[in-house]
Amino acid sequence: MDTKQAVLDILNELTGEDLSDQMDENIFENGLLDSMATVQMLLELQDKCDVTAPVSEFHREDWDTPNKIIAKVESLRNE
């Protein structure tokens, strides 16, 4: 599964929303993810995308849209 689809699947599971046509939607400002769901998202990304995304290094502004999450996961894969 590619990164984009994995991220969208995780977000859909956590938010109940299909964000595939809202790739620049701010998921925090719009109340789609809270702090508990954010931790769950990071755990799911680690599991499904084989990346390490520690909560301690999480900066909301770097992860606030589906596009940014995809870019961050791809960046972590290349480290």
Swiss-Prot record:
Keywords: Cell wall biogenesis/degradation, Cytoplasm, Phosphopantetheine, Phosphoprotein. 4'-phosphopantetheine is transferred from CoA to a specific serine of apo-DCP. One of its GO terms (biological process) is cell wall organization. Its main location: cytoplasm. The keyword Plastid does not apply. It is found in: Cytoplasm. GO terms for molecular function: D-alanyl carrier activity. Belongs to the DltC family. HAMAP family: DltC. Pathway: Cell wall biogenesis; lipoteichoic acid biosynthesis. It comes from the Bacteria. Gene3D superfamilies: ACP-like (1.10.1200.10). This is D-alanyl carrier protein. One of its GO terms (cellular component) is cytoplasm. Carrier protein involved in the D-alanylation of lipoteichoic acid (LTA). The loading of thioester-linked D-alanine onto DltC is catalyzed by D-alanine--D-alanyl carrier protein ligase DltA. The DltC-carried D-alanyl group is further transferred to cell membrane phosphatidylglycerol (PG) by forming an ester bond, probably catalyzed by DltD. D-alanylation of LTA plays an important role in modulating the properties of the cell wall in Gram-positive bacteria, influencing the net charge of the cell wall. The modification O-(pantetheine 4'-phosphoryl)serine is found at S35. Residues 1-77 form the Carrier domain.
